[in-house]
Amino acid sequence: NETAQNSLLKVIEEPPEYAFFILLCENRNKILPTILSRCASVLIPPLSNDEIFEIFGSKNEFLAAYSMGNPGKFLSLSEDGEFLTLREEFFNKIPMLIQKKRTSIYPLCEFFEKNKDEKDTLFEFLTLFFGDILLKKNFLEGRIINRDKTETIDRFNTETTKQSVVSSLEIIAKLQRELGKYGAYALCVNDMFIKLWEEING
C-alpha cells in the first residue's frame, strides 16, 4: 500500500553502503512514481514450461500453464492440496451448465456459495475454462490452460457457439464487477449461472 511504500522511500534515498535492496512486484503500475524513480527496473521474463519441469522434476501441464511461467506459483500450487481438490470439484460440477433443465445448475450455484471464501480462485477457473473453449473454437489448442480436461472442453465446444462463449465471458466479467459494488454474493452468483445457462442453451 501507499503508506508502506512511503516508509521505504527514505531508506531507498539513503541506503547503507553495505546493502542492496531488491524489491519484487508483479505489477509496476502499483508502485509509486517516487519509488520507481529511485530504482533500476529489471524485467524477469516468465519461464517456459520445459524450464519449470526441469527445475522441479514435475510435468504437470496444467499447473505450468496456470502459473504462467512463475516458478514460485508453480511450487506453491503443486503443494496446495485444497487448490487441486477445489479444481476437481469445479470440473465435476461445470457440465451442469449444458444440461437441458435449468434446475440442473442449482448444485453449481451451491458449490460457488459454499466456497465463497475461494471466490477469486473459482472465478479464475470459470474465466480460464471459457477462455479455453474459445481457444478450441479458434484452433489454438496449444494455448489451452486446462490441458488435462480436454474431454470437458470438447463437450462444451460441441454444445456452444463462438458468440455464446464470448457472451458468457462478458457475463462472468460483469458479475465480478458487480460483486465489488453490491456484495450480494449468493444472488449475483445465481443470476450469473442462470444467464450462462440461457446463453448456452438458448
Model-derived regions: residue spans:
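Conserved amphipathic alpha-helical interaction elements at protein-protein interfaces in regulatory
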Residues: E13-E14
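Conserved AAA+/SF3 P-loop NTPase catalytic/coupling segment centered on the Walker-B
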Residues: N1-L9, I31-L32
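Charged, glycine-rich active-site and insertion segments that engage polyanionic ligands
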Residues: E17-F20, C25-F125, F129-D132, K136-G202
